[in-house]
Amino acid sequence: MRHLLDFQDVNKNHLENLIEKTRSLEFKSENIDSLALLKFDEPSTRTRLSFAIAAEKLGIKTFESSDVISAKQKGEILKHEIETYISMGIEILVLRTKENNIDDYREFKDIGVISAGFGNKSHPTQALIDISTLFSLNKINEKLTPITYIGDVKHSRVFESGRQLLNLLGFKVGVFTDKNLLPENKNDLEIYESWDEVFESSNAIELLRVQKERLQDNEEINFDEYINNYQLTQEILGKSQSDLAVLHPMPINIGIEISKDAIDDRKIKYKDQLSHAIPSRIAAFKYLRDEI
């Protein structure tokens, strides 16, 4: 069975079909009659709920688990864990984890694995949401960088998957952030030094929260300085183009990446992203079943 761990093994045709399915906003009920395990080892609201609803729409029965209540607490290895799921008829594993051992899951052939957020490595269905939103808002322009990510790109799986997806479509992405939050791999990136450069080069931006839970002991962030330089405020929005689209994968930390006076501006499009949440997860399930 296929996996959707990231976009490494997804060809351009399949990727375009995934985007089209996500853009369609379809909620058509089906009766696939399959079993899926939603294993979330990190907190989640939108991702977990939208996967559960998407499965329900497709007739996929879901069960839930996490490392806290699994035999991993007793030392069970991954191979035995997956063999157990397969023996019980689980065909799809939807996994959210803080770990980065994504390649270990590529080896499994009798169960399809979807990344619902994999360490700082991948979050493919969120990337589908974000880029589908941009297409729906007509923000993909070959003359411009489709999107500039602002904030903690170093630790962001949303950034990594968005970058990978857009690279497959032939685009570079922009970055505007503190030097300590730049990714190690800077290939195919446009690195901007000011808000003015961002607005001159992109039709859309995506704000990313500082991932405090992933900061290492040797990574220090001066939050006062960060907020002063990279927080999106109403004043800064007023200097942007009238048709700018501002995305955010959520949860939003008001007062850090965006000010309270800016959150309700008409340019803020997180509600458009939310409308694509269930369709993106429907698309992921269908991709695993070779229906896309």
Where do the protein language model's features map onto the residues?
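Adenosine-phosphate binding glycine-rich loop
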Residues: 243-244, 250-292
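Short, structured coil segments at secondary-structure junctions
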Residues: 58, 108-110, 169, 187, ...
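Glycine-rich phosphate/diphosphate-binding loop of Rossmann-like nucleotide-binding domains
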Residues: 41-56, 135-209
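Rossmann-like adenosine-cofactor binding region
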Residues: 186-261
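Positively charged, low-complexity intrinsically disordered leader regions
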Residues: 1-49
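Phosphate-coordination loops involved in phosphoryl transfer and adenosine-cofactor binding
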Residues: 30-36, 143-147, 243
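Phosphate/diphosphate ligand-binding glycine-rich loop within oxidoreductases
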Residues: 32-135, 254
